[in-house]
């Protein structure tokens, strides 16, 4: 009976991916580090970009927002590819940059999903009730996450790059099982501190989401014929991660 209030707490949480605040912080940091000309565009069309984030969230919980690596189910992986190609085509076709900004907002949300362990694996059925708790925890602790930029991939290709993204994020999922059921009983994020496994996973997922988005922004802008000369200084000469705070 002691576990009933805990379960009720989980059930009371809204069903989301990363929260809107989390999505915005990831996107804003990536825009700040992206191609300067693209940054000017997205600053000018910030309302449209944010509307894109909101649109992407509208069908959250559907197969469009997950790709479970082991079972190969869900459309998130394919949707990232399709949105990337569509945006490049729109820029080439001289579509309104307001519309492009909106689609980039949608794509930004999808990249954040790809860096969420709960969107890349579902093989521990016990964790279903912890999904939204972890995402709320991510938002609460986000101000304490350093932004570690892992660099631009000089050989960036969306397909192979995001294969690695999904494989990496999926490896964090067992750590969620370990954290939420440490000691054999269900816990909540109220039990976690900044030395916890959950904090470490959340922090790393944040930095990888920013890094992935910066890489994708540079790729899109380059493929669309934009100026990406700033890419040279975004690469670490010795391959080490860069602290971007």
What is each residue range found by the language model?
Residues 100-108, 112:
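Short alpha-helix carrying the canonical HExxH Zn2+-binding catalytic motif
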Residues 111-120:
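Secretory-pathway/luminal and periplasmic proteins that interact with or process carbohydrate-rich
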